[in-house]
């Protein structure tokens, strides 16, 4: 059977699509390969969220296109967000591409690959934006065996002024609770111990299906599943974080005391311009409530600097808020002017040099805050999953704590007098803190 190589770019939501496509291809007897030079067909699942992601996607498309000349590749398929957003331009400007497939057509990947391998006409499929996978969709996990992402909804109904995702991914649509529960049980039976729940807006979960937010009820269904060690939430909107959700997180011991709560800014003028439906005071109250009701919770956020109209006073207000709230984790991004979004047409666009200068100032402050927050862990025992044997002879391991999401947060390096396996969950006593990472020893 033909062999397939797939390169997945961008966020975990895109990764789930890639895993479903690989699962469908494997189920239909395609051979999956990591060697692009030996692949009969190559798939690039692209990101198109901001300018740097678009540039990275295009660079990889050109790199893989070369295998049509110097490898055995007969078909190049481009999928994902960039494919949806710029389908016509990509097909016109990169002749090596055979098919453009939008995220609404993930389930058609087998048909599309066969079509391309048979040398049929080049074409695009980007019309439908209704698809969402379910518990019956095969998946070939690309994450470590003990962790998996589960997409609980697709699309987005938020119309933030800077973002094109609603046009790329379609309207928000939730999966039924029963579907998610069945998938999680199946993953746990296969050895997964950490489930990371994702969507464009996880806190909106259920509104379209049930007429009310039901993330709390979903967590209550998943919490008792035997063998499930950690449940983690990413991409939560501050204005939809209900008291019931806080209660569910506080009462279920295997829900990580960790929340990803993108704020994007703190100045109310900028939040309004961004069309973010939250004020600084509302965010402050929520964060205080989270820290009171869930003692020890770690809060991650993200901020955009250099949004159109952001003055030095607005930026200082953001820095003051960061200093006041002391987020445990924060990512800072410079505003990207995305065509087709309201923000792209706004006056008072900020010069790139000023954006970079504000980015570095915000990150400098956050590094100081992160170090201070991490130093509070010294002397504590925290739960860690072993991810790497760093030095077998010296008993040195690298892991990730329940307070850290994969890829985006820090690590824990520690020593152990007994051998450990990758995927083991252990208690580590922290004895040293860095800006993002912790160090310690296996707790006795």
Curated annotation (Swiss-Prot):
PROSITE patterns: MTTASE_N, MTTASE_RADICAL, RADICAL_SAM, TRAM. Its EC number is 2.8.4.4. One of its GO terms (biological process) is tRNA modification. It catalyses: L-aspartate(89)-[ribosomal protein uS12]-hydrogen + (sulfur carrier)-SH + AH2 + 2 S-adenosyl-L-methionine = 3-methylsulfanyl-L-aspartate(89)-[ribosomal protein uS12]-hydrogen + (sulfur carrier)-H + 5'-deoxyadenosine + L-methionine + A + S-adenosyl-L-homocysteine + 2 H(+). The keyword Mitochondrion does not apply. Pfam families: Radical_SAM, TRAM_2, UPF0004. [4Fe-4S] cluster 1 binds at residues 11, 47, 81. It is found in: Cytoplasm. Coiled coil: none annotated. SMART domains: Elp3 (SM00729). GO terms for molecular function: 4 iron, 4 sulfur cluster binding; aspartic acid methylthiotransferase activity; metal ion binding; protein methylthiotransferase activity. Keywords: 4Fe-4S, Cytoplasm, Iron, Iron-sulfur, Metal-binding, S-adenosyl-L-methionine, Transferase. One of its GO terms (cellular component) is cytosol. Its main location: cytoplasm. Catalyzes the methylthiolation of an aspartic acid residue of ribosomal protein uS12. NCBIfam families: 30S ribosomal protein S12 methylthiotransferase RimO (TIGR01125), MiaB/RimO family radical SAM methylthiotransferase (TIGR00089). This is Ribosomal protein uS12 methylthiotransferase RimO. The lineage of its organism: Bacteria, Bacillati, Bacillota, Clostridia, Eubacteriales. The gene is rimO.
